[in-house]
């Protein structure tokens, strides 16, 4: 999979500034996976194979993980919600799009993590709205900590930067 992602320039080498402010010689641009349905399908299936039983909803972090969550939602019949980066200030003023009931169990999908701060922030927003984050999976982890946690939940990953 790593070589396939490299061949499509989803994994790039060079000098890059990351969202965390760190610099890296490797950049993982999973937002471009939507242009390669075959690779997208493979990664979605890898994520789906890790989903624990009794999940009520799937949510992808904005915006990189939304295509993953959408595909998995449709193919695995798991209702999806969409977490906005910022709450709307018009219309319904929603932070979360899609139907949900407080107390439902959510799997949160992320594309790439470095510190884990973005996915933890997303998990907190879901919980503030009455949802229970039961599982967190990221496609790639850049974290130096191989055992990132949120509350008592291990942040699982398909691939680690060390695999590249």
What are the language-model segments listed below?
Residues 68-107, 117:
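Short, glycine/charge-rich flexible loops or terminal/linker lids adjacent to PRPP-binding catalytic cores
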Residues 54-62, 138:
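Short glycine-rich phosphate-binding loop at a beta-alpha junction
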Residues 52-56, 101-103:
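Short helix-loop-beta connector
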Residues 49, 70, 74, 124, ...:
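Short, well-ordered alpha-helices that flank and scaffold nucleotide-derived cofactor binding pockets
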Residues 1-5, 123-164:
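PRPP-dependent phosphoribosyltransferase catalytic core
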Residues 1-53:
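Active-site-facing substrate-recognition patch
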Residues 101-132:
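A contiguous pocket-lining binding segment that forms or flanks enzyme active sites
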Residues 58-59, 81, 134, 156:
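Structural detector of well-ordered beta-strand residues that form the stable sheet scaffold
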């Amino acid at each position: 999979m790593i070589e396939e992602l490299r061949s499509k320039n989803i994994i790039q080498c060079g000098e890059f500034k990351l969202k965390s402010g760190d610099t890296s010689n490797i950049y993982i641009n999973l937002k471009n996976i939507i242009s390669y349905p075959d690779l997208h399908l493979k990664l979605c299936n890898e994520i789906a194979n890790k989903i624990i039983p009794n999940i009520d909803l799937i949510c992808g972090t904005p915006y990189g993980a939304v295509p993953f969550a959408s595909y998995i939602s449709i193919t695995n019949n798991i209702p999806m919600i969409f977490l906005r980066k910022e709450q709307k200030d018009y219309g319904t003023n929603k932070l979360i799009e899609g139907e949900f009931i407080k107390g439902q169990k959510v799997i949160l999908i992320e594309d790439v993590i470095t510190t884990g701060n973005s996915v933890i922030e997303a998990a907190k927003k879901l919980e503030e709205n009455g949802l229970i984050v039961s599982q967190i999976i990221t496609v790639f982890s850049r974290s130096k900590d191989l055992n990132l946690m949120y509350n008592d939940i291990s942040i699982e990953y398909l691939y680690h930067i060390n695999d590249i």
